[in-house]
Regions:
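Substrate-binding clefts and catalytic carboxylate motifs of secreted carbohydrate-active enzymes
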Residues: 1-109
Length: 109
């Protein structure tokens, strides 16, 4: 089984309140993962979070913009993956989606 988690896209963290909604995004992500782990357990299938992400602070796309909230969100997700791996649950791993990557964003937003 695989899941995606996009707190901004799903309305858990509006672009003008990313830092303020970080805890809500974490809590909703945990609930979403746990719900899908229950389904994975029912069918005895591993669960992979194949795609997730969190925007840069202030919804900026510049490579030099701050990523404090995103770093905190990623740490939370990676800690969940590590905790589940240590407990030998069906949560098999994750990938993350890199916003900005090698592309050069337009300064026109």
């Amino acid at each position: 089984m695989n899941i995606h988690i996009w707190p901004y896209n799903w309305g858990w963290a509006p672009k003008d309140r990313l830092q303020e909604n970080l805890e809500k995004a974490k809590q909703n992500s945990k609930v979403y993962i746990d719900e899908h782990l229950a389904v994975a357990k029912k069918y005895q299938k591993p669960l992979v979070m194949e795609e997730f992400g969190y925007p840069r602070d202030n919804f900026q796309f510049s490579k030099s913009s701050s990523v404090k909230a995103r770093d905190a969100y990623y740490k939370y997700i990676f800690d969940l993956v590590l905790d589940n791996a240590s407990s030998h649950t069906l949560f098999a791993g994750c990938n993350f989606w890199g916003w900005g990557g090698f592309a050069n964003p337009s300064e026109r937003i």
